[in-house]
C-alpha cells in the first residue's frame, strides 16, 4: 500500500492525523477548535497560532506591510470567534535570502500596527532562513468563558457579523484578472489585502453566543463545522451576499451563491444565539459598532440546507483547504 502524501490528503486530513497522534487532551477545548485553552493556576490561558505562506496566502499585489497586517488579523479573527481579547503576540518568520531588509521592516511594521489596532503588542519572536516567506503568529490571552463550536442547540438562531462574497470576488479580480466595476473595486480588494477581524463584535457576543467560528475557510464550511461539533443541522434562510459581490458575479457570469458560500479569506464571525438572547446580542453588537445578520436556524435534522428561490438545496461541506484548493 502506497503512503498517502500531504498533497493527496489535504489540510483537514492532516489535522485529523495530528489529533489521532496526540489523542484526547485534558484541556476544556479539544484540538480542532479555533483556539487552545489551558488552566494556568485558575486562569483560562488562551493560545492561538496560524501561519501565512507566501505561495498560498500572499497575492502578488500584496505589499510587505499588508503581509504583516494579514498574518496578525488571521489569528485575531479566531480569538474573536471565541470571545477572547489577545494580550500579546509573537512572530516566527522564515525569510528567503533575497528578501529586502526594507521590506522585512515594513512587514514587521504591518504586524505591529495590526496588533495595536486590536489592543495588544508584538512582544518578540524568531527569524530563520527559508526558501520562501513564511510568517507564523502566536497569540495569548485570558478568558473566564470560551464560546465553543459545540454549543448550538436546535432552535438557536444562526447569524453572521457581515456580508459574504467580497474576498472571493476580490481574489478572482486580482488573481484571474476578472473585471470589476470601478466603484466596487475597493470594496472587493480591501478585504483581501487588508482584512479586518471582528474582535469588538466577538467580545460583545461572548455572553450570548452558544457557538461560534470564524469564516476564513468559507461560510458553508464554517456552518458545517458548527453543525458537526454541535450535533445539529442548519437551515439557511437568508444568504448574506454583499451587493458588490453580486454585481461582480453578474458581470462575470459567476454564481453569487458560490462566491458567498464557498469562498475563503473572509473574516466574519458565524454564531448561534438562543432565541431568548437574540435582542440583547444584537443590541450589544450594535453598541460595539457592528451588526448582527440573522441568516437561519439550527435544526434537529443533521444536514445543512439553504432556501434558494423558495426551495431547499443542500449546502455542500466545502471551502478553502490547503493542498487541495
What are these regions (language model features)?
Residues 1-325:
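Helix-biased detector of long, well-ordered alpha-helical tracts
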Amino acid at each position: 500500500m502506497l503512503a498517502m502524501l500531504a498533497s493527496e490528503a489535504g489540510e483537514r486530513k492532516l489535522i485529523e492525523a495530528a489529533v489521532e497522534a496526540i489523542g484526547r487532551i485534558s484541556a476544556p477545548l479539544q484540538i480542532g477548535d479555533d483556539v487552545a485553552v489551558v488552566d494556568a493556576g485558575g486562569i483560562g490561558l488562551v493560545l492561538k497560532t496560524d501561519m501565512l505562506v507566501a505561495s498560498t496566502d500572499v497575492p502578488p499585489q500584496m505589499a510587505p506591510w499588508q503581509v504583516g497586517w494579514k498574518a496578525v488579523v488571521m489569528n485575531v479573527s479566531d480569538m474573536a470567534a471565541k470571545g477572547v481579547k489577545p494580550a500579546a503576540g509573537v512572530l516566527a518568520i522564515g525569510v528567503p535570502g533575497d528578501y529586502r531588509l526594507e521590506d522585512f521592516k515594513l512587514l514587521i511594521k504591518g504586524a505591529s500596527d495590526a496588533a495595536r489596532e486590536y489592543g495588544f503588542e508584538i512582544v518578540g519572536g524568531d527569524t530563520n532562513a527559508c526558501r520562501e516567506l513564511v510568517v507564523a503568529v502566536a497569540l495569548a490571552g485570558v478568558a473566564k468563558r470560551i464560546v465553543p463550536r459545540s454549543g448550538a442547540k436546535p432552535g438557536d438562531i444562526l447569524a453572521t457579523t457581515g456580508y459574504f462574497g467580497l474576498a472571493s470576488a476580490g481574489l478572482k479580480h486580482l488573481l484571474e484578472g476578472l473585471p470589476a466595476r470601478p466603484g466596487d473595486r475597493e470594496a472587493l480588494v480591501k478585504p483581501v489585502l487588508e482584512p479586518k477581524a471582528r474582535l469588538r463584535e466577538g467580545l460583545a457576543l461572548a455572553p450570548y453566543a452558544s457557538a461560534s467560528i470564524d469564516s476564513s475557510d468559507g461560510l458553508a464550511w464554517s456552518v458545517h463545522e458548527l453543525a458537526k461539533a454541535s450535533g445539529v443541522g442548519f437551515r439557511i434562510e437568508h444568504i448574506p451576499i454583499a451587493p458588490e459581490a453580486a454585481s461582480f458575479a453578474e458581470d462575470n457570469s459567476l454564481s453569487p451563491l458560490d462566491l458567498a458560500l464557498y469562498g475563503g479569506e473572509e473574516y466574519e464571525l458565524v454564531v448561534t444565539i438562543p432565541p431568548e438572547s437574540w435582542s440583547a446580542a444584537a443590541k450589544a453588537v450594535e453598541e460595539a459598532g457592528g451588526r448582527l445578520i440573522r441568516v437561519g436556524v439550527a435544526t434537529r435534522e443533521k444536514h445543512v440546507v439553504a432556501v434558494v428561490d423558495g426551495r431547499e438545496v443542500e449546502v455542500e461541506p466545502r471551502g478553502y483547504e490547503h493542498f487541495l484548493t
